[in-house]
């Protein structure tokens, strides 16, 4: 039995969020294949620490154990992480950045101690991560802002194995469609990813 944690970083209300609807479908398909797995959700929009941005004025406070350990221990306690991360102004949402700043902590989720070549060693090698990303523009329009690539790099840095589901063109290809309507044309991909997760 695996423990799966869904991280919702969408700044859009659930019923209007393309990425959230894809994630709920992924959850449903995943549980059909893994009915005994335990699923929980963390909505970063509801997390007080999710709105605490790292600045020069609060860096000591930001990295205090009581601020980072609960979030780090939460991902250490699960086997799989599903990250809902729509492109927002050419990046992932600010709440996700704030959360990542709290879980990417030296000697807790990565280390330089035992590296032979001066690089880092990820300490979260037990973790499988599925990134669910949507963007309004078609694929390739904004190569400098590929949220999936950015997040893949961050999670691989801490040692995780990473896969992704990306749906591009929600403001073009899927224009005038409701979030639930983008699930159907992407259902085969979602089922395939759920099967291999």
Curated annotation (Swiss-Prot):
Reaction(s) catalysed by this chain's protein: 2 a quinone + NADH + H(+) = 2 a 1,4-benzosemiquinone + NAD(+); N,N-dimethyl-1,4-phenylenediamine + anthranilate + 2 NAD(+) = 2-(4-dimethylaminophenyl)diazenylbenzoate + 2 NADH + 2 H(+)
Positions with a binding annotation for FMN: 10, 17-19
Cofactor binding description: Binds 1 FMN per subunit.
Top enzyme category: oxidoreductase
This enzyme's EC code(s): 1.6.5.-, 1.7.1.17
Keyword terms of this UniProt record: Flavoprotein, FMN, NAD, Oxidoreductase
GO MF annotation terms: electron transfer activity; FMN binding; oxidoreductase activity, acting on NAD(P)H as acceptor; oxidoreductase activity, acting on NAD(P)H, quinone or similar compound as acceptor
Listed cofactors: FMN
Subunit composition and interactions: Homodimer.
Function: Quinone reductase that provides resistance to thiol-specific stress caused by electrophilic quinones.
Matching NCBIfam families: PRK01355.1 (NF002370)
Family named by the database record: Belongs to the azoreductase type 1 family.
The name this protein goes by in its record: FMN-dependent NADH:quinone oxidoreductase
Species name: Mycoplasmoides gallisepticum (strain R(low / passage 15 / clone 2))
């Amino acid at each position: 039995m695996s423990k799966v944690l869904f991280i919702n970083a969408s700044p859009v209300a659930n019923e209007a969020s393309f990425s959230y609807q894809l994630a709920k479908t992924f959850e449903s398909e995943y549980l059909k294949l893994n009915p005994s797995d335990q699923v929980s959700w963390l909505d970063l929009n509801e997390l007080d620490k999710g709105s605490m941005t790292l600045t020069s004025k609060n860096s000591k406070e930001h990295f205090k154990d009581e601020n980072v350990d609960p979030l780090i221990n939460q991902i250490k306690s699960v086997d799989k992480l599903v990250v809902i991360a729509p492109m927002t102004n050419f990046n992932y949402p600010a709440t996700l950045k704030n959360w990542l700043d709290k879980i990417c902590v030296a000697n807790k989720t990565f280390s330089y101690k035992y590296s032979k070549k001066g690089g880092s060693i990820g300490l979260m090698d037990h973790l499988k991560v599925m990134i669910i990303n949507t963007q309004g523009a078609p694929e390739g329009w904004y190569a400098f802002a590929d949220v999936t690539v950015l997040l893949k790099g961050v999670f691989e840095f801490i040692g995780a194995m990473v896969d992704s589901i990306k749906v591009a063109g929600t403001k073009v290809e899927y224009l005038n469609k409701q979030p639930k309507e983008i699930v159907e044309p992407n259902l085969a991909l979602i089922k395939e990813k759920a099967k291999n997760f």
